[in-house]
């Protein structure tokens, strides 16, 4: 335990909080260009072909971003918007692609949870 004199000389230092999404530079979203669009398999016990893309961001970072929803139109050189949010069963994937923004289309025939997939309200 430090004495009061020691604390006066050198106060206790605060812990620095480490960001889970360093590539965003404390921004809500970032724009980037797809450099590679591919599928990858999740870790045990899950099994699937998850759609992901490698993105070169405007600040120079190169990150892996998950493409949510059924079907997508992304290819190399597509300009997309990414947000934070990791995918628990894909190691190294800490960002999500924002559907319905820039070159990324919304999910076709989506009726519920539309706002998360960039889909407008259907005509009645």
Swiss-Prot record:
GO biological process: translation
Modified residues (3-methylthioaspartic acid): 89
GO CC annotation terms, alphabetical: small ribosomal subunit
GO molecular function term, any single one: tRNA binding
CDD domains: Ribosomal_S12 (cd03368)
InterPro entries according to UniProt: NA-bd_OB-fold, Ribosomal_uS12, Ribosomal_uS12_bac
UniProt keyword list: Methylation, Ribonucleoprotein, Ribosomal protein, RNA-binding, rRNA-binding, tRNA-binding
Gene3D superfamilies assigned: Nucleic acid-binding proteins (2.40.50.140)
Pfam families per record: Ribosom_S12_S23
Function of the protein: With S4 and S5 plays an important role in translational accuracy.
Subunit structure: Part of the 30S ribosomal subunit. Contacts proteins S8 and S17. May interact with IF1 in the 30S initiation complex.
Protein name per Swiss-Prot or TrEMBL: Small ribosomal subunit protein uS12
